């Protein structure tokens, strides 16, 4: 029997499942799993996971704290409830995201991350099994620097530029997630044209970041994310890790054939590359001059916050129904 493309990819790259759907993840046996508010919201709407929602509400309601913070406490428990279930399935790490509203507050991000790790510990999930996802703002990256120094590994997300990637690596981030598909989306909208896979701006961006990291010897893992097609996934074969949706994993599993390695550390070492300055002033200037990074970073934070707000409404409605039933 011929090798599937998914198996061929696995010879060169660690495959990660990008989903909160526990049953879907179980079927692909990935090494790791990533979640975000959008994926948790999608999973929370599935009847199969109503029990996990109830667990989170019970845990959050039982926790001491002011009434105005109840829904946020429940949200933390919801993320950890899903993450703990995922940690039972994958042998590696599970990424859990910090509230998007904290993207510009270093100390609040650190505090929330430490709280999430504590909630995981209470469920018997060790800190080394968890990556805390933090948006690639300057403040977020500073939080990552603090968290990494305290032994909490981080996944820097919403990476759309080399400046963000390098700043995260210099802060000691365990892993970064450059967003392939959203970069492509921006260029398609801006130019009004389509791109062949060899010209795909998202693929090129991840390739540039990977090459830079390997050339200068950064230990930070590059994990391509946000794919629009299986062709994009194949085009980044050899990247440290790739986090892929169940739909695209299914496509790759249903196709046979070789997937050639495209990214190679040895070739990256031989490349001619200049170092990039990423102090605060230069970081902010480079993001300011990069319309794609500016727009997509802001949009990504807004979208994650919108989905978190949708989760808040769902929880509030559930709490109201419970209160009316008791009354």
From Swiss-Prot:
One of its GO terms (molecular function) is transaldolase activity. It is found in: Cytoplasm. Its main location: cytoplasm. It catalyses: D-sedoheptulose 7-phosphate + D-glyceraldehyde 3-phosphate = D-erythrose 4-phosphate + beta-D-fructose 6-phosphate. Homodimer. The keyword Cytoplasm applies. This is Transaldolase. Transaldolase is important for the balance of metabolites in the pentose-phosphate pathway. HAMAP family: Transaldolase_1. Pfam families: TAL_FSA. One of its GO terms (biological process) is pentose-phosphate shunt. GO terms for cellular component: cytoplasm. It is an enzyme of class 2 (transferase). Keywords: Cytoplasm, Pentose shunt, Schiff base, Transferase. It comes from the Bacteria. Pathway: Carbohydrate degradation; pentose phosphate pathway; D-glyceraldehyde 3-phosphate and beta-D-fructose 6-phosphate from D-ribose 5-phosphate and D-xylulose 5-phosphate (non-oxidative stage): step 2/3. InterPro entries: Aldolase_TIM, TAL/FSA, Transaldolase_1, Transaldolase_AS. Gene3D superfamilies: Aldolase class I (3.20.20.70). The active site is at residue 133. The keyword tRNA processing does not apply. Belongs to the transaldolase family. Type 1 subfamily. Its EC number is 2.2.1.2.
